[in-house]
């Protein structure tokens, strides 16, 4: 059986945690960690560029709230002016391949998410810790 000691009672800890303003911290943590994924997506997409339109369009949007909580989109946006094809559509073709054109899948999204997972979690934890320090919790 595990045993631990603490200087804070469970009631004090719960009171401190319930005073955390999730509405303020969640979007901030997401927006501060998004550039990590953005940089990796650009790095992995760079070798596959033809015109550079898709790679240049990779950006992080602002955090948004839905019924499930906060989320943030990092990826290609907009439309290629020359071809009229949406940049996210190009990224999907790259990720999954196109059978009709014998284009093999060369994933960039899944490897970017997997390789940045730990750094993103560390960044979000750091943001949370700074929030706690600044608010004396």
What residues fall within each predicted segment?
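Short, Lys/Arg-rich flexible segments
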Residues: 1-73, 92-137
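A short, structured beta-strand/loop element
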Residues: 77, 81-96
């Amino acid at each position: 059986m595990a045993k631990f000691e603490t200087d804070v009672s469970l009631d004090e800890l719960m009171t401190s945690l319930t005073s955390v303003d999730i509405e303020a911290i969640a979007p901030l943590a997401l927006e501060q960690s998004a550039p990590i994924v953005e940089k990796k997506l650009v790095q992995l997409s760079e070798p596959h560029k033809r015109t550079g339109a898709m790679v240049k369009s990779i950006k992080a949007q602002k955090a948004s709230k839905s019924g499930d909580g906060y989320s943030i989109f990092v990826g290609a946006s907009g439309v290629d002016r020359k071809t009229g094809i949406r940049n996210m559509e190009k990224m999907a073709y790259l990720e999954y391949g196109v059978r009709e054109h014998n284009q093999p899948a060369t994933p960039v999204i899944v490897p970017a998410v997997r390789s940045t997972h730990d750094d993103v979690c560390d960044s979000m934890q750091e943001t949370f810790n700074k929030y706690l320090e600044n608010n004396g919790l």
